[in-house]
Amino acid sequence: QVEEGNTRVENVSELEKELEEKNPTHVISLIGRTHGTYEGEYIGTIDYLEKPGKVFENVRDNLFGPMVLSLLSKKHDFHFTYLGTGCIFQFDDEHPFGEEKDGFDESSLPNFFGSSYSIVKGFTDQLMHLVEDSVLNVRIRMPITDEFNKRNFITKITNYEYICSIPNSMTVLPELLPYVLDMMKNK
């Protein structure tokens, strides 16, 4: 049985009460801020978080929220799954462009700090390692599905004026999610 949470994560005491009442075996965090409306214009990418005054939302939704869920899950012995991001890495000497033979792994530290989003998510990723005995940290990149949806990466790029041709990682959600469920079951 799957239940959606009703409490905003910044309301920690109410969230803890809801978790205690529902008493789940697993908690899954799909929390994250990558888009929003700024001055009446919808911005569907992390460019939204680069706008003035968006630090609060970025930290609340991309750091505080997931960490609150992970800490409450640990406290109450619920397995916690965090869908984080791989947008915290860039090519470097150990991972040269065009030579994808040795990728980043679970122990890799973030090395991309080119956006507010990546900085905050990079620190969230590092903090998740402090509770890794009770956390499954899944790093996804540019999620795609076969559905037409404004949050689907394929749908997004059809609206871009320019597209660069650089090899990159993408997450095919219908293929990934069964593996995530298996990993959650096997904790």
Task: Label every model-predicted segment.
Residues V9-L63:
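NAD(P)H-binding glycine-rich loop region in Rossmannoid oxidoreductase-like domains
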Residues G114, Q126-D182:
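NAD(P)-dependent short-chain dehydrogenase/reductase
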Residues K51-G65, C87-V138, T145:
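Catalytic helix-loop patch of NAD(P)-dependent Rossmann-fold dehydrogenases
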Residues L30-I31, F80-G86, V138-I140:
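SDR active-site strand-loop-helix element
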Residues Q1-V9:
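A short beta-strand-loop structural module common to alpha/beta enzyme folds
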Residues F64-V68, H79, F123-T124, V172:
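Conserved cofactor-binding/catalytic machinery of classical short-chain dehydrogenase/reductase
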Residues M183-K187:
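Core catalytic loop region at the nicotinamide-binding pocket of NAD(P)H-dependent oxidoreductases
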Residues K75-F78, D133:
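A short helix->loop->beta-strand "cap" motif at the edges of active sites that frequently abuts
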